[in-house]
């Protein structure tokens, strides 16, 4: 939200997991979409998850930008026909992903499911556990990890799950914040 406000971009937050009726949204009225994470699985039989995938496909047809983070990336993957599957062991905490250019990036993971490669997508990030990020068509990016977090958010997520996380220095997260800013600017400006 901070980046959008700095750019003069109006944002509207919908919480379909709490009953916000996204199935009633007109995709033609939406300039772009960011789909964030959550504790549910994209494989759960929930009406709002299905409606969100329809919205993602509709925005793609309109060439509108979509950024998916964690569950959001999995929603993009499933919306276009690839699989999301349970990992043998969840990825939780700070870890490293490797960009296709060979650069290493420290990121925060909090997921127990992984994505199959979406046919036609460009891999952006991977690690030894799974596909971690991709671009699809011109205006869609999915990231399995969280670049939007702060040290305080990481501590709160760990505490809420009764899985305390080691303290994280802001400097460790700064390169990820810069990558996120570049993605937002590419998609939404």
Whereabouts are the PLM-identified features?
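Short loop/helix-cap segments at secondary-structure boundaries that form the rim of catalytic
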Residues: 1, 23-28, 76-78, 116-119, ...
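Cysteine-nucleophile active-site neighborhood
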Residues: 35-100, 104
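Amide-donor transfer/coupling interface in amidating biosynthetic enzymes
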Residues: 98-189
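Short loop/edge segments at beta-strand edges and connector loops
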Residues: 15-18, 86, 109, 125
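N-terminal beta1-alpha1 cap of cysteine-dependent amidohydrolase-like domains
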Residues: 1-64, 159-189
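Conserved beta-strand segments of alpha/beta enzyme cores
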Residues: 10-12, 83, 106, 122
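Short amphipathic alpha-helical segments
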Residues: 1, 45-48, 80-81, 120-121, ...
């Amino acid at each position: 939200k901070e980046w959008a406000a700095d750019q003069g971009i109006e944002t509207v937050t919908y919480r379909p997991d709490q009953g916000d009726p996204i199935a009633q949204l007109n995709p033609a009225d939406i300039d772009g979409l960011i789909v964030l994470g959550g504790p549910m699985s994209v494989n759960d039989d929930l009406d709002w998850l299905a409606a969100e995938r329809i919205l993602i496909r509709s925005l793609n047809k309109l060439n509108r930008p979509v950024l998916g983070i964690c569950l959001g990336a999995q929603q993009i993957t499933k919306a276009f026909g690839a699989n999301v599957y349970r990992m043998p062991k969840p990825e939780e905490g700070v870890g490293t992903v490797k960009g296709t250019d060979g650069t290493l990036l420290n990121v925060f993971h909090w997921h127990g499911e992984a994505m199959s490669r979406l046919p036609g997508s460009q891999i952006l990030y991977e690690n030894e556990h799974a596909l971690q990020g991709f671009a699809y068509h011109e205006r869609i990016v999915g990231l399995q990890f969280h670049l939007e977090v702060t040290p305080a958010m990481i501590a709160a997520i760990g505490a809420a799950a009764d899985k305390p996380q080691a303290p994280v220095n802001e400097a460790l997260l700064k390169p990820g914040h810069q990558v996120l800013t570049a993605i937002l600017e590419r998609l939404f400006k």
